[in-house]
Amino acid sequence: MAGYELRMRRFTFAPGSVFGPLHDHRGRPGLVYILEGTITDHRDGIATEYGPGPGWPEDRNTTHWLENRGTVPAIEVSVDIVRRA
């Protein structure tokens, strides 16, 4: 895919932290894998908790924000396809 690159990032969410604001994934599809802890994904008015293992896909229809409601750090690996800078 000319002009694009595969990006992999690791995020650590401290207990009580929020990853926002509300954002979308138009133009940068991806997926998330949870390594440790629990992350709550908020989309379409629904909060879904994900623990260690496969998380969620992110596509052109994804608009969401995330938080760690737990008492321990949550760690995720996020992989997406982005336009090359």
Where are these regions (language model features)?
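A short, N-terminal "cap"/entry segment at the start of jelly-roll beta-barrel domains
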Residues: 1-7, 49, 56-57, 85
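Conserved hydrophobic/aromatic beta-strand scaffold that supports enzyme active sites
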Residues: 8-10, 31, 47, 55-57, ...
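Histidine-centered metal-chelating micro-motifs
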Residues: 18-20, 24, 56, 60-67
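A short glycine-rich, His/Asp/Glu-containing loop-to-beta-strand
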Residues: 1-22, 74, 79-82
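Glycine- and acidic-residue-biased ligand/ion/polar-headgroup-sensing regions
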Residues: 27-44, 54
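Ligand-binding loop in jelly-roll beta-barrel domains
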Residues: 40, 60-85
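Extracellular/periplasmic catalytic domains that process cell-envelope and extracellular macromolecules
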Residues: 25-26, 33, 69-73
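Short acidic-glycine-tyrosine-enriched beta hairpin
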Residues: 13-14, 44-62
